[in-house]
Regions:
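Double-stranded RNA-binding/processing signature
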Residues: 1-140
């Protein structure tokens, strides 16, 4: 499952594998799991914040840039299976690729270990990481999204 989570579509295309062998479906699932867990986290951490502000804050927390930051902290790029062309053009460091891989990893953790393990991973390596590095945007910054 982990190998599937780090397999980019460029690698699958280059190796003439089935499209389903890349991480895109796991990314889809991981995105949904991340949205649910981050929503729950914000709901309980910001009990007086109105719904619109919670939505903006969540969007800023799970955006490509924030997830890419967390992926860099985990050195996720070094584990990616990329096609030669994608690798040669800096794909390991591209925010869109690393953030997608992080969502795929969340999807894999959810499928393999269940909701509780996915939640533990997200709290430890994404939500707490973002708080510790001041990436949680204020409502003014979220308005700019």
């Amino acid at each position: 499952m982990l190998r599937h989570a780090v397999t980019h579509s460029s690698y699958v295309n280059e190796k003439h594998m089935k499209k389903a062998d890349c991480n895109e479906r796991l990314e889809f699932l991981g995105d949904a799991v991340l949205e649910l867990i981050s929503s729950e986290y914000l709901f309980f951490e910001n009990q007086t914040m109105p719904e619109g502000e919670l939505t903006k804050l969540r969007a800023s927390m799970v955006c490509e840039k924030a997830l890419a930051f967390c992926a860099r902290d985990l050195e996720l790029g070094s584990y990616l299976l990329l096609g030669k062309g994608e690798d040669a053009t800096g794909g390991r460091f591209r925010e869109s690729i690393t953030s997608d891989a992080l969502e795929a990893l969340i999807g894999a953790i959810y499928l393999d270990g269940g909701f509780a393990n996915a939640k533990e991973f997200i709290l430890k390596y994404i939500l707490n990481d973002l708080e510790g590095n001041c990436l949680l945007y204020t409502s003014d910054a979220a308005d700019e999204l």
